[in-house]
Curated annotation (Swiss-Prot):
Its main location: cytoplasm. Belongs to the class-I aminoacyl-tRNA synthetase family. The alpha-helical N-terminus (residues 1-72) mediates interaction with AIMP1 and thereby contributes to the assembly of the multisynthetase complex. Residues 1-72 are annotated as: Could be involved in the assembly of the multisynthetase complex. It comes from Homo sapiens (Human). Residues 529-543 are annotated as: Interaction with tRNA. The gene is RARS1. PANTHER family: ARGININE--TRNA LIGASE, CYTOPLASMIC (PTHR11956:SF5), ARGINYL-TRNA SYNTHETASE (PTHR11956). The keyword Aminoacyl-tRNA synthetase applies. HAMAP family: Arg_tRNA_synth. Its EC number is 6.1.1.19. This is Arginine--tRNA ligase, cytoplasmic. The modification N-acetylmethionine is found at M1.
């Protein structure tokens, strides 16, 4: 729906429907008037006039709503889809759901956007035994285009492509609106709740590089949906339950017997875990005690529960160090949260007749899925299947989620598709109403294209990886002698921005479904599509106004008073690129592929460089360096680029700095 009227779309749709019915009623009355003398003729004519008057008022009201200024950025593809949708409906009123294909043009010679609906409509007409050339269809569509604020002209090319050229004044006005009102999307997700399940490490084990992707991708998806106006609940489904806690608690009792009264100095939890695992594997007596501890924990024994909480707290402190460093916020809701709901889940499936017993296990076969779910093990214990079913039900019925996104590696794809199918089978949700989605991702590889490991073959600890990033970032800044021009505070801010920004961007700039090679050398390279290059580009853009002695207040005043000219081809290219931001975000809201945003920011930075090299923003005396003239409309273009880049960085979880 046209974002210009997004806030009143429901009202407009209602008005449009009323217009259609009124038009039909007028036609009916006209026909009645031709039936010859009628005692009601005067009454009918009077009614006809009233209907025409109401119709005229509604049309004016509709146009006024469309022309009403909006503080939100316009999704130009959505606007053009609406315009062409009207034209296609008018040209081919009998076609049901005709294709509506509007895309950005790949080359400037083909205009700014293309409507490629004619070929699809030709195929639809062929099935109705109407043979019409796609080019004729394209001509018919263009004849029916309604008056609108955005199209300058259309051209028909090739077999029936409609090339669309935007009005310069329209683009200029939208850029001005962006500068005056800020980078804003319409409230697409108003009154809608999204749950994003991500990160989800195991308690008592350190986070490793495998958790990095889920954490970074999940946080970025959450930020995007928040920006689009959704109510987002970020959940950390930590592994805080199960057999491993039996051995950890038993080891805690032996190593710190006074743990109930004196807080145990566990120190390195990874070492503590390895010690307990070694004993579990080699000492039969210890193994028995560990199992007893699990039973006592499930029975909510107070001393055992305290030991469990102590271990969780120590682990949580370590996890929070990483979340704080990466600026990630999560609500912890681990497997333990769902323990009391498991019995009801099993009973519900049993009552509905979905449970079969196989070798002591209770299993559920789901139509279309090759592997059954095991909801009760042969020893009577529950499984990941049971807890994931309990979690999805709680999120649907108690949280009342409109959308649930699971950011978990590709290896869990079959598991989640089976969980989703089981939830649909039992009637918990309808996929046409509620979107439940597994946003899978590939593994992190080393430069040898094998799973990323330390030299000794161990999994890379995430804290060590972040520390290495900080070190290399500082080395790079000193290599560029930035330590000689930045204050200590600015240098530290730049170090953190580059280190964490590069790690996040290297991940997010790859298609999440693919494995990606982790290389500090590549991610810290300040050439090409890297965070280092983009962060430098951003600080350069921000410095243009500063070096011209133009402050924020002057820019805001200019935004309200200065028309943005787009006469130079590089100005025009940059202006259009800036305004593509909403359509890029809409695509990602649909498919959750964040590399599209990275590609866009890189494209924007490249378009800016072309513009800056061709168009003087500030004209100086070549001898003295004195500023002779400031081309304010170009300064405003710089500001618009910076505003969109800053919002893009924010969605990606990257913190730019003003000086680098």
């Amino acid at each position: 729906m046209d974002v210009l009227v997004s806030e009143c779309s429901a009202r407009l749709l209602q008005q449009e429907e009323e217009i259609k019915s009124l038009t039909a009623e007028i036609d009916r009355l006209k026909n009645c008037g031709c039936l010859g003398a009628s005692p009601n003729l005067e009454q009918l004519q009077e009614e006809n006039l009233k209907l025409k008057y109401r119709l005229n008022i509604l049309r004016k009201s509709l146009q006024a709503e469309r022309n009403k200024p909006t503080k939100n950025m316009i999704n130009i593809i959505s606007r053009l889809q609406e315009v062409f949708g009207h034209a296609i409906k008018a040209a081919y009123p009998d076609l049901e759901n005709p294709p509506l294909l509007v895309t950005p043009s790949q080359q400037a010679k083909f205009g700014d956007y293309q409507c490629n609906s004619a070929m699809g409509i030709s195929q639809m007409l062929k099935t109705k035994e109407q043979k019409v050339n796609p080019r004729e269809i394209a001509e018919n569509i263009t004849k029916h285009l309604p008056d609108n604020e955005c199209i300058e002209k259309v051209e028909i090319a090739g077999p029936g492509f409609i090339n669309v050229h935007l009005r310069k004044d329209f683009v200029s006005e939208q850029l001005t609106s962006l500068l005056v009102n800020g980078v804003q999307l319409p409230a697409l997700g108003e009154n809608k709740k999204v749950i994003v399940d991500f990160s989800s490490p195991n308690i008592a084990k350190e986070m490793h590089v495998g958790h990095l992707r889920s954490t970074i991708i999940g946080e970025s998806i959450s930020r995007l949906f928040e920006f689009a106006g959704y109510d987002v609940l970020r959940l950390n489904h930590v592994g805080d339950w199960g057999t491993q806690f039996g051995m950890l608690i038993a080891h805690l009792q032996d190593k710190f017997p006074d743990y109930l009264t004196v807080s145990p100095p566990i120190g390195d939890l990874q070492v503590f875990y390895k010690e307990s695992k070694k004993r579990f594997d080699t000492e039969e007596e210890f193994k028995k005690r560990a199992y007893q501890c699990v039973v006592l924990l499930q029975g909510k024994n107070p001393d055992i529960t305290k030991a469990w909480k102590l271990i969780c707290d120590v682990s949580r402190q370590e996890l929070n160090k990483i979340y704080d460093a990466l600026d990630v916020s999560l609500i912890e809701r681990g497997e333990s949260f769902y323990q009391d709901r498991m019995n009801d889940i099993v009973k519900e499936f049993e009552d509905r007749g979905f449970v079969q017993v196989d070798d002591g296990r209770k299993i559920v076969f789901v139509p279309g899925c090759s592997i059954p779910l095991t909801i009760v093990k042969s020893d009577g214990g529950y499984t990941y299947d049971t807890s994931d079913l309990a979690a999805i039900k709680q999120r649907l019925f108690e949280e009342k989620a409109d959308m649930i996104i699971y950011v978990v590696d590709n290896g869990q794809s079959v598991h989640f598709q089976t969980i989703f199918a089981a939830a649909q089978m039992i009637g918990w949700y309808d996929p046409k109403v509620t979107r439940v989605f597994h946003a899978g991702f590939g593994v992190v590889l080393g430069e040898d294209k094998k799973k990323f490991k330390t030299r000794s073959g161990e999994t890379v600890r995430l804290m060590d990886l972040l520390g290495e990033g900080l070190k290399r970032s500082m080395d790079k800044l000193k290599e560029k002698e930035r330590d000689k021009v930045l204050t200590a505070e600015e240098l530290n801010a730049a170090q953190t921005s580059v280190a964490y920004g590069c790690i996040k961007y290297a991940d997010l700039s790859h298609n999440r479904l693919n494995d990606y090679i982790f290389s500090f050398d590549k991610m810290l390279d300040d050439r090409g599509n890297t965070a280092a290059y983009l962060l430098y580009a951003f600080t350069r853009i921000r410095s243009i106004a500063r070096l011209a002695n133009i402050d924020e207040e002057m820019l805001q005043k200019a935004a309200r008073e200065t028309k943005i000219l787009l006469d130079h081809e590089k100005e025009w290219k940059l202006g259009r690129c800036i305004l593509r931001f909403p359509e890029i975000l809409q695509k990602i809201l649909d498919d959750l592929f964040l590399h599209t945003l990275c590609d866009y920011i890189y494209e924007l930075a490249t378009a800016f460089t072309e513009f800056y090299d061709s168009c003087y923003c500030v004209e100086k005396d070549r001898q003295t360096g004195k500023i002779l003239k400031v081309n304010m409309w170009r300064m405003l273009l710089c500001e618009a680029v910076a505003a969109v880049m800053a919002k893009g960085f924010d969605i990606l979880g990257i913190k730019p700095v003003q000086r680098m």
